[in-house]
Amino acid sequence: DYLGVCASTGGDPDYASACNDKLVGAWSYTHDAPSETVTPEDSDGHGSHTASTVAGNTVDVEFFGVPVTISGVAPHAQIIAYDVCYPTPSGGQCAGDDSVAAVQQAILDGVDVINYSISGGEDPYNDAVELAFLDATAAGITVSTSAGNSGPDAGTVAHRSPWVLSTAATSHNRKFTHTV
């Protein structure tokens, strides 16, 4: 059972009305952001994209004229958004202390899974966010993190903590070649 509330720490009551049976909570932890960006709204769409991959509702669509049904991995799951990033002129900022506060709130909210699609986690034993993930894991929460976009070489994977699932994407040309 979800223990949180659908509220904005930014003081905008309109965000509570955006909650529904899919989005059951929305929190902003962007405390260092300029005041106009302190909302739980997804400023660049990345969080919404990953949330739909994880928990998108089942929908019927047409793909090249063929009707198909698609959904996220867990279409009956509910989402609580914990916004920890905000836009800046140089791209964006995700402060570690904001992430730690959001993980602590997720533990209090009784979530089952945390999806953290933000790079980082250089040192599992000295990084505050990685240690917050350890607290979440100790509370019985599965933590899935981004492996990052730094490349295939050794040491380029983010979030190497043994208590998280570091998740990556790949592509494949579907060709298997063999020389005889």
How does the language model describe each region?
Residues 1-95, 109-112, 124-125, 138, ...:
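Subtilisin-like serine protease catalytic core
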Residues 28, 118-119:
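Short glycine-/small-residue-rich Rossmann-like dinucleotide-binding loops
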Residues 98-110:
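Short, well-structured alpha-helical segments in soluble
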Residues 104, 131-134, 158:
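Alpha-helical segments flanking ligand/cofactor-binding loops in enzyme cores
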Residues 121-130:
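Active-site core of PLP-dependent enzymes with the aminotransferase class I/II
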Residues 140-143:
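Hydrophobic beta-strand scaffold residues
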Residues 148:
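Active-site glycine-centered loops adjacent to acidic/histidine catalytic or metal-binding residues
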